[in-house]
Amino acid sequence: MLMVISPAKTLDYETPPVTQRFTQPQYLDHSQELIQQLRQLTPLQISELMKLSDKLAGLNAARYASWHPDFTPQNAKQALLAFKGDVYTGLDAESFSEDDFAFAQEHLRMLSGLYGVLRPLDLMQPYRLEMGTRLANARGKDLYAFWGERISQWLNEALAAQGDDVLLNLASNEYFGAVKRKALQARIIDTEFKDLKNGQYKIISFYAKKARGMMARYVVRERLRDPAGLKDFNAHGYYFSAEQSGPEQLVFLRDAPQD
């Protein structure tokens, strides 16, 4: 079973990594193509394109200028430890053992507007480029056109390498939109996490993001390979709803927040 999650806008390059192991991103030629295009934009253009403040636009213009594909632990950090935010709070990779990282490296992928697909231990230099950004490029009007079917092909390769055909989608719609479902040689399992609010179960973004991270953590810590085991997920009060679920859509409910 292979999992995919979204990246995060917030990055942490200050905290020392809890593992010294690292790998190199596999698709840097494509990343470099995007960087070369981003370098042509002024901070004002970046601000307008990405709807960023002047300060953040300037920061990312500097990031694009200093980005280079010679990644080392001195100028980059493992992706799973560099990303912060709700998903990564739930995932809590800082508490992983070396065996946890080894399992995650095989069974977890992060989708990225700049890097396409990242493995947990892939070194990553800081950036801001959300998948939904309408960055016109040689392949089309946006990043979905830029990546085309590549991401699906790379996920197929990862599935083939582990001899499996199950993809657990824990990514947002924005990011999983870059995956061509019909091109995937896999059974796709989607997930929903709902919390009780005003008498109804609803998807509450903050909680749902954190729950997706907790589900990824559950799979890693339990060394889960059979999707049937996903139904036993019960972190922080969530429980599987057979009534609301289907064969390829697993729904988890929670009656009260526990965090």
Swiss-Prot record:
CC per GO annotation: cytosol
Any one of the GO BP annotations: response to hydroperoxide
Domain of life: Bacteria
PANTHER family the record matches: PEROXIDE STRESS RESISTANCE PROTEIN YAAA, PEROXIDE STRESS RESPONSE PROTEIN YAAA
Family per record: Belongs to the UPF0246 family.
Protein name in UniProt: UPF0246 protein PSPA7_1607
Gene source species: Pseudomonas paraeruginosa (strain DSM 24068 / PA7) (Pseudomonas aeruginosa (strain PA7))
